[in-house]
Amino acid sequence: MLQALKESKDFLQLTLAQPQHFDETFTFMLGSHTQVEVWDTGVIVFEPKVARGKDIVLSCAVHGNETAPIELCNGLIKSLLEERLIAEQRVLFLFGNPPAIINGTRFIDENLNRLFNGAHSVGEGLVNPERIRAKKLEFYVDKFFSSSKDNSHKIHYDLHTAIRGSKHEKFAIYPYRPGRKYSGEQIMFLEACGIDTVLFHHEPTTTFSYFSSLNYQADAFTIELGKVLPMGQNDMTRFIALNEMLSRLIGNKSLELPDFNAKTVNLYQVCRAINKGFDDFEFTFANDVENFTSFPKGYILAKEGGENIKVEHEVEAIVFPNAKVPVGQRTVLCLKPASTENIDG
């Protein structure tokens, strides 16, 4: 495996050749400047000889059919392996669900991004590949962050693409973080990446980004980069700014970020999540309605169990509507304009 990776510089290819697990870990040097550690299938770490104070996790393929982030991350890994990009920050790359990548599906048995923060072991326990993988991914993130310096700046960008179109093509979800202000610098970094819309979540979740935010106080985000497309059909020119900014971050180059300015970004507060209570749950709007479509107060968003579910605020926008989830899971997030008072500018 080591020789194959050294020759191809293609970590995704190596991962998909053995999607379940690697039988052995291996380590090698890039020149005299970076140690590369492969911990498992889809798990590779770059440890610079002299790190500059940031510990960066870049995860993708938590949903296997969300291909643009996979291509983006594999390109960054290849640049590092070819030494066109030299890491001056510690960085961990994760391909979340390799079997689902091969399958071209969101998941095999269960939505991996509902299984973090210990959810993998609740109820039935470790009964399917996604639950087992979620526990392993938590372990790898813990291993990475726990081996850093105490005062390091921990960052986790969990990269996705969305099922449906969106009025804001690229957007980020900032996990719930009570008692901690949101980072204006991080919001401006995202804006420089071409991600000009941020949602502030209102409650704990079982997502990968919330896991890192809660347990390691990382600046963590779930980042949506447009619409799901098959592998090889993504227009990667749409991610030039993101690729450039991530390369600068990894290489410890100047980010040249302006001060926080709310006028340059779209900020939303999640005001509620609507969970499915009955099998007959259905939305009243068309299946092709875009993310961030707004509805006025009193509008009937959905019906279930003989009851109407209505818009509660003057205006609410919606994201991630999905009526086909199992009973008990989230069908949609409702949003209102966000205040800037809890942002550290």
From Swiss-Prot:
> Recorded GO terms, molecular function?
hydrolase activity, acting on ester bonds; succinylglutamate desuccinylase activity; zinc ion binding
Which superkingdom is the protein from?
Bacteria
The EC number(s) given in the record are 3.5.1.96
Associated pathway: Amino-acid degradation; L-arginine degradation via AST pathway; L-glutamate and succinate from L-arginine: step 5/5
UniProt-annotated catalytic positions? 224
| Cofactor note as given | Binds 1 zinc ion per subunit.
Q: InterPro entries this protein is in?
A: AspA/AstE_fam, AstE_AspA_cat, Aste_AspA_hybrid_dom, SuccinylGlu_desuccinylase
Name the cofactor(s).
Zn(2+)
Q: Which catalytic reaction applies to this protein?
A: N-succinyl-L-glutamate + H2O = L-glutamate + succinate
What CDD domains does UniProt report for this protein, alphabetically? M14_ASTE (cd03855)
Per UniProt, the enzyme's principal EC class comes to: hydrolase
Coiled-coil ranges from the UniProt annotation: none
Q: Which UniProt keywords apply?
A: Arginine metabolism, Hydrolase, Metal-binding, Zinc
GO BP annotation list? arginine catabolic process to glutamate; arginine catabolic process to succinate
> For Zn(2+), which residues are the binding ones?
63, 66, 160
HAMAP family for the chain: Arg_catab_AstE
What protein family does this chain belong to?
Belongs to the AspA/AstE family. Succinylglutamate desuccinylase subfamily.
- Function comment: Transforms N(2)-succinylglutamate into succinate and glutamate.
**By its UniProt entry, which NCBIfam families does this protein fall under?**
arg_catab_astE, PRK05324.1
Recorded protein name is Succinylglutamate desuccinylase
Q: Which organism is it from?
A: Shewanella woodyi (strain ATCC 51908 / MS32)
Lineage of source species: Bacteria, Pseudomonadati, Pseudomonadota, Gammaproteobacteria, Alteromonadales
The gene behind this protein is: astE
